[in-house]
Each structure stands twice: as C-alpha cells, then as structure tokens.
Amino acid sequence: RVLVYASGKNRGGLSQSIIDHWETAIYEDDLWRLFLGTQQPPADWHGISFDENTWTSAPGGFGYGDDDDNTLVPDTTTSFYYRRIFTVTDPTKLDSAILSMDYDDGFIAYLNGVEIARSSNMPDGAVDYLTDTQTDHEAQMDVGGNPDGFHTSKAKMASLLVVGQYVLAIEVHNVVPPSSDLSGRTWLHFGINSSDVFYGPNPPFFGNVTTTAYHTNFKIGFGETVTLYGADGSLIDSI
C-alpha cells in the first residue's frame, strides 16, 4: 500500500539505499524533556546546544484523553514540546531513517534544529505555541492501528549526520480547542547498511509502518476528478 498526499509539497519517497537491517534509536517510553505550550519556548529549543535542564524529565508518550499516554498533560493544552538526546558513532553506516509518530492532532519534528517531518495538517512555515492544526487527526495505536512513518532520505541524512550527539525534538499541536484528546508518541529508527549493531530492537509494529513520505507537486480541488493510469497508459480507476 502506498499513501500519496495531493498536498502540492512535492516530496519524494524512499531512496534506493541498500539496507542490511533496521534498528531503533529512540523509543516512545524513553525519558524525554517536556515543555508545555503555555508560552513560546526559546528559539533554540530544538537545537543540541539548548540547556534542557529546566524542562520536565518524563517518560513518553505525552497527552490526554485516549488512555494511551505515559505522561498526562492538562486537558486545556494547545501544544507541547519534547526532546531527547542520542549519539551517532558512525554516520556512514546510517543510510536511512524513519520517524514513527502516533499523534493527535499535528506535529513538526526536528533533528538538531533541522525540520525532518511535518504532518500534512500543520500550516506551512513558522508556527508558534498557539498555532492550531488545520484539520483533526486521530491517533491510531489506542484503537489497534499503527503509527505513521515519515522517511528521511539518504541524501538528507548525509547532510545532517556526523559523529556526535543529536537531539530529536517534537512539537505537537491540537486542533481548535477545546479538544477531547491530544497525543504525541515517538520512535526513531535507522536503516543500517552493514551488519553492525548500534541501537536497539524494533517495536512489534515497525514492519507495518506506512511511510507517509509521498506528496504530489499539485493540489486537488473540490469536485475535480482523480484518474489513475498504469505504467502502460491504461486506465485503472477514477473517482
């Protein structure tokens, strides 16, 4: 199954890397640093040099309303921010990355301050702690589903990774409050191009993650017809 967003954002899919195996570097229930969005966080909150010691240390995931959160936040929360530091010892062996996100309603993810994923219901450009999502999005794992997967290409990985410490930082936003639920559950997986082992085993759901990395370079308006053709030009379906 391939999920394609007609978003106009023109984002490609998985690179043709040769991956020996996958490992998980960050888990949902690891200890993270958490900041509630009652005010704007410092501008460098998603960078590795930020002093996170004033933020709360708590196990993920975070949220309220779905009975699937290890750390509860107030049910009046519009947004919250969380981050976790990890180490890369040999970036040449990390060919690909997938961020697994189970979220309600929207999020933006950063690696050392560089954006690597954004849910399709978040506005483009800069956002602040009061930004609402454009539509709602329900978390899936509490009803037996799987998180969404967001792929980071080999080319982008090469531009980001050197030996040293990294921080994965996430901001989660609610749809127009009051909302019945809010959730952020996060895993970070790496595709390893050798038999070397750097991190931990993958969670059970990982083999079923849908990588939501495909976005068209056009948008579809209300009432327009969508037509699917095969590689030979034959009509497959239309709606």
Please place each PLM-identified region on the residue numbering.
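Solvent-exposed beta-edge/loop recognition patches
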Residues: 1-21, 135-186, 190-239
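Ser/Thr- (and often Asn-) enriched beta-sheet segments in non-cytosolic proteins
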Residues: 2-3, 49, 54-56, 71-72, ...
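Acidic glycine-/aspartate-rich tracts in secreted/extracellular proteins
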Residues: 6-11, 35-42, 61-63, 90-92, ...
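Extended carbohydrate-recognition surfaces in non-catalytic/accessory domains of CAZymes
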Residues: 18-94, 125-152
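Aromatic-lined ligand-binding clefts that engage carbohydrates, nucleic acids, or primary amines
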Residues: 32, 55, 86, 92-113, ...
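Acidic side chains
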Residues: 51, 90, 102-105, 181, ...
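Short, glycine/acidic-rich beta->alpha junctions
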Residues: 78, 101, 210
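Residues at beta-strand starts and edge strands
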Residues: 78-82, 95-97, 105, 164-166, ...
